[in-house]
C-alpha cells in the first residue's frame, strides 16, 4: 500500500471515500492489516483490556503504548500509525508533549487524546511542536468512572449542542482528526459536516468519514463474552484472518458497514 499520510486522509474526506482504521498491537497483525488495505492502525490503550486482561484501559502506561507502537511499526506496510496517550498521560500540556514525543519516537505518526474543549490548549501546544493530534470525543473510556459506565453520549440536546461546539473548537485549536465513539448517528453526521478534518466513527453511524473497530472484536474474539452493538464479526464465513481483514476494508469502503443496526438513535 502506498504510504498513508494526513494529506491522504484529508484527500479521502474531500473525495467522499471512506477511511478504514483498526486497532493493532503487534508486528504480525500490522503487516496483515496494512496489506489488506487498512489505512490507519490505531495502537489503542484498549490493549489494556484485550491483551493485558484488565477491566478498563486505566492501568495502561505510556511505556506500554511505546512498546506496542514500536512493534506495530516493524510490521507496518504503509499505513498511518495512530497511538493513544493513555490515562493521565496528558494531565498537563507539557506532560502531554513529553509523552507524545516518546510515542512519536517509537513510530507513531499521530497521537490520540480523549477529551473535549478543555483539550484545546494541549492540542494547540502539540500541533505547534509538530505532533498531529486526533481528538477522541463522545464515549471516552478513560473517563468511564465519571460517565457511569460505557454509555451512548450526546442523546440529550444540550449535550449534543456542546459536543458540536467542542468539535469545532478542537479543530480550531489544531486537531488533525476526530474520533467519535458511541454517539447518535444523526449527531455524528452533523459533526462530520461541521468540521473540515476527517472524522472517524465507532458506534457513530455510517455518515462519518471512516470507521474503526477493535481488532479482536471484528475477529470474533472476546474475553468478556459481551459484544458491543456496533461490532460485526468479520471472521464469520471467512476462511482466514487475512480474508476477514479484507472483508472489513471492503465493507467500510462500500458503506455496507456499519448498517443501521450498528448505530444509535438520539
From Swiss-Prot:
Q: Where in the cell is it found?
A: Cytoplasm
Q: In which pathway does it act?
A: Cofactor biosynthesis; (R)-pantothenate biosynthesis; (R)-pantoate from 3-methyl-2-oxobutanoate: step 1/2
Please tell me where this protein is predominantly located: cytoplasm
Q: Which GO terms describe its biological process?
A: pantothenate biosynthetic process
Q: Which CDD domains match?
A: KPHMT-like (cd06557)
* GO molecular function list: 3-methyl-2-oxobutanoate hydroxymethyltransferase activity; magnesium ion binding
Under the subunit heading, UniProt states: Homodecamer; pentamer of dimers.
Q: What does this protein do?
A: Catalyzes the reversible reaction in which hydroxymethyl group from 5,10-methylenetetrahydrofolate is transferred onto alpha-ketoisovalerate to form ketopantoate.
Q: What is this protein called?
A: 3-methyl-2-oxobutanoate hydroxymethyltransferase 2
Species = Pseudomonas entomophila (strain L48)
Amino acid at each position: 500500500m502506498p504510504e498513508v499520510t494526513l494529506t491522504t486522509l484529508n484527500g479521502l474526506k474531500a473525495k467522499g471515500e471512506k477511511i478504514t482504521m483498526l486497532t493493532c498491537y503487534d508486528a504480525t497483525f500490522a503487516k496483515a492489516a496494512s496489506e489488506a488495505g487498512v489505512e490507519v492502525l490505531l495502537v489503542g490503550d484498549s490493549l489494556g483490556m484485550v491483551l493485558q486482561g484488565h477491566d478498563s484501559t486505566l492501568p495502561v502506561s505510556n511505556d506500554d503504548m511505546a512498546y506496542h507502537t514500536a512493534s506495530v511499526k516493524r510490521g507496518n506496510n504503509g499505513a498511518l500509525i495512530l497511538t493513544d496517550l493513555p490515562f493521565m498521560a496528558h494531565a498537563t500540556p507539557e506532560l502531554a508533549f513529553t509523552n507524545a514525543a516518546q510515542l512519536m519516537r517509537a513510530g507513531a505518526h499521530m497521537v490520540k487524546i480523549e477529551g473535549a474543549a478543555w483539550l484545546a490548549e494541549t492540542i494547540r501546544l502539540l500541533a505547534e511542536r509538530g505532533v498531529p493530534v486526533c481528538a477522541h470525543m463522545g464515549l471516552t473510556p478513560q473517563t468511564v468512572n465519571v460517565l457511569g459506565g460505557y454509555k451512548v453520549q450526546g442523546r440529550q440536546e444540550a449535550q449534543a449542542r456542546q459536543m458540536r461546539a467542542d468539535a469545532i473548537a478542537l479543530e480550531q485549536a489544531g486537531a488533525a482528526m476526530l474520533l467519535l465513539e458511541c454517539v447518535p448517528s444523526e449527531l455524528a453526521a452533523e459533526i462530520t459536516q461541521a468540521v473540515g478534518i476527517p472524522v472517524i466513527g465507532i458506534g457513530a453511524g455510517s455518515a462519518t468519514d471512516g470507521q474503526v473497530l477493535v481488532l479482536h472484536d471484528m475477529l470474533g474474539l472476546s474475553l468478556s463474552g459481551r459484544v458491543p452493538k456496533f461490532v460485526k464479526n468479520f471472521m464469520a464465513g471467512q476462511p482466514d484472518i487475512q480474508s476477514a481483514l479484507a472483508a472489513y476494508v471492503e465493507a467500510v469502503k462500500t458503506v455496507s458497514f456499519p448498517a443501521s443496526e450498528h448505530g444509535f438513535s438520539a
